[in-house]
């Protein structure tokens, strides 16, 4: 379970994403399936902590160490302040603070990287990305203030009825208004 843009990012690095079923009880990848799917070409195991559940990563860290695979954890849904800074054996721990996260900054992220050379390389790449302006952030703040206000049940019901009256596709209109990633090429700087 992840957003489709993650697969796009993986492919952009010349890698092939291989999805693995998760256990319905633990929302963790099934280790026995990983054992079946691993090959000499396997490079990275990406585990997403879903719905605020922090998956015990030690068995996956052991699996990655045994198979010489990087362990990357997506902590976007598991940020809990000082309670969890990522697993100590994860090679990369990613935390994002988008508008729909439980702990939001309306954007931005933190990456904890064990390997200092990899961290430096990532920092060098990040430096060429354009910096968002204060105006961009103000527009975003205004947009999500109104979305939050309009999500109040009494107003939401009226808005849905108005959208139907105007023959607007309710689902696609809401999706477009709350889109976390830009449309088009995600990897264009």
Mark where each language-model region is.
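A short helix-to-beta-strand connector/capping loop
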Residues: 67, 89-90
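PLP-dependent aminotransferase-like
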Residues: 1-82
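Active-site region of PLP-dependent enzymes
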Residues: 79-82, 92-107, 112-189
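A generic secondary-structure signal marking the coil-to-beta-strand transition
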Residues: 41-43, 90-93
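Short glycine-biased active-site loop of nucleotidyltransferases that positions the nucleotide triphosphate
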Residues: 84-87
């Amino acid at each position: 379970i992840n957003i489709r843009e993650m697969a796009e990012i993986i492919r952009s690095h010349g890698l092939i994403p291989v999805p693995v079923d998760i256990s319905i009880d633990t929302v963790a990848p099934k280790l026995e399936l990983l054992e079946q799917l691993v090959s000499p070409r396997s490079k990275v195991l990406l585990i997403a902590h879903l719905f605020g559940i922090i998956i015990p990563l030690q068995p996956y860290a052991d699996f990655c160490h045994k198979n010489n695979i990087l362990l990357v954890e997506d902590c976007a849904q598991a940020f809990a302040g000082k309670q969890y800074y990522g697993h100590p054996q994860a090679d990369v721990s990613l935390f994002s603070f988008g508008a729909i996260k439980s702990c939001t900054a309306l954007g931005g992220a933190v990456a904890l990287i064990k390997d200092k050379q990899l961290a430096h390389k990532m920092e060098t790449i990040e430096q060429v990305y354009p910096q968002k302006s204060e105006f961009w952030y103000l527009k975003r703040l205004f947009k999500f203030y109104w979305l939050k206000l309009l999500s109040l049940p009494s107003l939401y019901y009226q808005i849905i009825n108005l959208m139907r009256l105007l023959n607007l596709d309710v689902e696609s209109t809401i999706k477009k208004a709350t889109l976390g990633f830009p449309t088009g090429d995600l990897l264009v700087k």
